[in-house]
């Protein structure tokens, strides 16, 4: 290379050194030497074009604070809260004091290694692959913004995602139609009954069930237009996960059950001097106030316990998964199931929610068996 830049072998990486604004800048590069030379030429070109400047002294923690403030108005409250906790409790103590201009891929890779081996705050080992990827996603996004604003020359977290452990998706639990019926009977006289009914009958998410009002139900059609989320300061309504409302045609039995619940709820509220209206939440406390999402999550297992030790220990969110599985087993078209769930593509539905149960496997085996019988008969007839 020219005298303006040098490349030195450092272990299993290369150190690139070059001049920027009268100062020496360095970058650690992993890969082949010819690729390191290509990278150095690109850096020198950026310097010549004036696109680079002396590395900023702003620390990573200071930048994350600014970045999170910019993101607050554009991000769901619960997501912003999770980002803030990752920045403050995971990234900050480890590499938060490193200036942005000195944050290298090698330093971030070391941080990721520490996350995997001793990242838990309680000192009991490393973080899960999913949490490690949450940290990487946040860091990559924040540093990408810094690079676009020319605070740093490039995003040092860009190429590190491939080094993180893969997330192994567990088999999702699901109830079959018979089990779903038993669960509905168990919760019928409780305040969480309509939430369970909407999750099973319409495939709604937890927050969507808790945000639905009587004004959203017209005949047998429920408009899913918002969600109720839990934040550090309380609860808040927000748009659905995919950002737009959807219309779900309810099974007639589900719609009838909701109308019966509406009468019961009106009587409950009247005893407290409260008048039911179109804005009244379908799933609410006895005084008409919103149910806390976490309260629903914690209350739900109590009813499962009443169904005996052999009953599947599903989470509330698994009722949505059960809804899709039951619909698929009943022969409902995959695209229609996807639309009811509010997914952007059929692939998401097939990958995450459509879980073949034992009955479906047995039916598939029978169809294959019947096909082989036809083949055997055809061969016999030809003989």
Show the residue positions of the predicted features.
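Basic, Lys/Arg- and aromatic-enriched nucleic-acid-binding interface segment
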Residues: 125-129, 133-137, 148-212, 241-245, ...
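Catalytic-site neighborhood detector that most strongly recognizes the C-terminal catalytic loop/helix
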Residues: 32, 166, 174, 227-230, ...
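N-terminal DNA-binding recognition helix of tyrosine site-specific recombinases/integrases
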Residues: 4, 10, 86-90, 97-113, ...
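Hydrophobic (often cysteine-bearing) scaffold residues that line and stabilize catalytic clefts
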Residues: 60, 76-79, 83, 104, ...
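C-terminal secondary-structure termini that scaffold catalytic or DNA-interacting sites
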Residues: 1-3, 185, 230-254, 260, ...
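Short, basic (Lys/Arg/His-rich) helix/loop patches that form interaction surfaces
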Residues: 121-125, 182-193, 202, 248, ...
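Short, polar N-cap/turn motifs at the start of nucleic acid-interacting alpha helices
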Residues: 215-221, 332-352
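N-terminal DNA-binding module of tyrosine recombinases/phage integrases
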Residues: 8-110, 260-282, 286-289, 358, ...
């Amino acid at each position: 290379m020219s005298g303006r830049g040098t490349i030195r072998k450092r272990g299993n990486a290369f150190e690139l050194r070059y001049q920027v604004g009268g100062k020496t800048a360095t970058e650690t590069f992993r890969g082949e030497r010819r690729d390191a030379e290509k990278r150095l030429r690109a850096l020198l070109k950026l310097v010549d074009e004036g696109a680079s400047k002396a590395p900023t002294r702003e620390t990573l923690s200071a930048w994350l604070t600014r970045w999170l403030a910019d993101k607050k108005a554009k991000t769901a409250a619960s997501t912003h809260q999770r980002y803030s906790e990752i920045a403050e409790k995971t990234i900050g103590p480890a590499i938060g004091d490193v200036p942005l201009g000195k944050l290298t891929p090698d330093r971030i890779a070391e941080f990721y290694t520490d996350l995997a081996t001793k990242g838990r705050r309680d000192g009991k080992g490393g973080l899960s692959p999913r949490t490690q990827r949450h940290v990487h996603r946040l860091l990559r996004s924040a540093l990408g913004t810094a690079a676009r604003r020319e605070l740093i020359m490039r995003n040092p977290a860009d190429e590190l995602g491939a080094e993180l452990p893969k997330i192994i998706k567990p088999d999702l639990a699901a109830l079959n139609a018979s089990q779903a019926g038993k669960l509905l009977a168990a919760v019928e006289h409780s305040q969480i009954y309509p939430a369970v009914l909407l999750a099973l009958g319409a495939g709604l998410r937890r927050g969507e069930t808790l945000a639905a009002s009587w004004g959203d139900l017209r005949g047998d059609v429920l408009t899913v237009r918002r969600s109720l989320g839990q934040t550090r300061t309380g609860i808040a309504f927000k748009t659905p996960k995919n950002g737009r409302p959807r219309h779900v045609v309810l099974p007639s039995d589900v719609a009838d059950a909701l109308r019966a619940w509406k009468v019961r709820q009106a009587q409950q509220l009247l005893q407290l001097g409260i008048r039911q209206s179109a804005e009244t939440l379908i799933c609410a406390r006895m005084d008409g106030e919103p149910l806390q999402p976490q309260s629903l999550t914690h209350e739900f297992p109590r009813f499962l316990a009443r169904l005996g030790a052999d009953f599947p220990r599903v989470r509330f969110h698994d009722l949505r998964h059960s809804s899709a599985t039951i619909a698929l087993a009943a022969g409902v078209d995959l695209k229609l199931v996807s639309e009811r769930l509010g997914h952007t593509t059929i692939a998401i539905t097939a990958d995450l929610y459509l879980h073949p149960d034992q009955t479906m496997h047995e039916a598939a085996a029978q169809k294959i068996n019947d096909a082989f019988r036809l083949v055997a008969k055809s061969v016999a007839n030809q003989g």
